[in-house]
Amino acid sequence: MNAHVPPESVSAAEDSWTVAGRTFRSRLIVGTGKYKDYATNAAAAKAAGAEIVTVAVRRVNLTDPTQPLLIDYVKPTEFTYLPNTAGCFTGEDAVRTLRLAREAGGWDLVKLEVLSDPKTLYPDMEETLRSLKLLVSEGFQVMVYCSDDPVYARKLEEAGAVAIMPLGAPIGSGLGIQNRVNLRIIVENAGVPVLVDAGVGTASDAAIGMELGCDAILMNTAIAEAKDPIRMARAMKHAVIAGREAYLAGRMQKRLYADPSSPLGGLI
């Protein structure tokens, strides 16, 4: 049975997904960067219907009371915080950052990303895998940003990742999902949730990710850099729902030739 498809008896209203023992109804995760202010960020997260928000521990103010605090706007009582290691280019930096996050907020469900270079922000998969093993040994529940390589996705799951998060395209590029085949293979082989992480630019990109069978979509720039972030957040919410519904419904088979909607027999 495909772990990413609920039993047929489950209605759309009851459809949910679970990661590290925590169950969520919304399949849209949003970031907390690039917004003009925290108030806009909070409004967008609510418009998206998100239950999880990612937080770049090294960039977002969580503790300095002399500056605006994210927690005063995007409240931890309303959202599940997912600390991440954005901006880390070595495994050591990533592990250190998440240790600090756990000390500061008690978070053990975290997102690991170890970047290879500033130009592409592609994940360094060797460093990612090495860091994952260390974090798992320390009791972290790790969701992992990774390449769209099915082999590495399997290795990450075997090493203890609680979710696999392959990029759709480079972070912040808005190019949409570039390799649907690999993403589909990752989904079919995975025993943990698979989330598109990075590259979504507009609503159709989010819908495609869900149509491919992904459990959820994570995005930041697509909403934050839209001309109207709140409206785009709403659009993304509906796109994720539509894509999920289409995946569960099962699309028609593609055909080379036409197949009339109305029978041709018995015509006047």
Curated annotation (Swiss-Prot):
GO terms for cellular component: cytoplasm. Pathway: Cofactor biosynthesis; thiamine diphosphate biosynthesis. GO terms for molecular function: thiazole synthase activity. GO terms for biological process: thiamine diphosphate biosynthetic process. Pfam families: ThiG. Its EC number is 2.8.1.10. The active site is at K111 (schiff-base intermediate with dxp). It catalyses: [ThiS sulfur-carrier protein]-C-terminal-Gly-aminoethanethioate + 2-iminoacetate + 1-deoxy-D-xylulose 5-phosphate = [ThiS sulfur-carrier protein]-C-terminal Gly-Gly + 2-[(2R,5Z)-2-carboxy-4-methylthiazol-5(2H)-ylidene]ethyl phosphate + 2 H2O + H(+). It comes from the Bacteria. Signal peptide: none annotated. Keywords: Cytoplasm, Schiff base, Thiamine biosynthesis, Transferase. 1-deoxy-D-xylulose 5-phosphate binds at G172, A198, G199, N220, T221. It is found in: Cytoplasm. Catalyzes the rearrangement of 1-deoxy-D-xylulose 5-phosphate (DXP) to produce the thiazole phosphate moiety of thiamine. Sulfur is provided by the thiocarboxylate moiety of the carrier protein ThiS. In vitro, sulfur can be provided by H(2)S. PANTHER family: THIAZOLE SYNTHASE. Belongs to the ThiG family. Homotetramer. Forms heterodimers with either ThiH or ThiS. This is Thiazole synthase. It comes from Caulobacter sp. (strain K31).
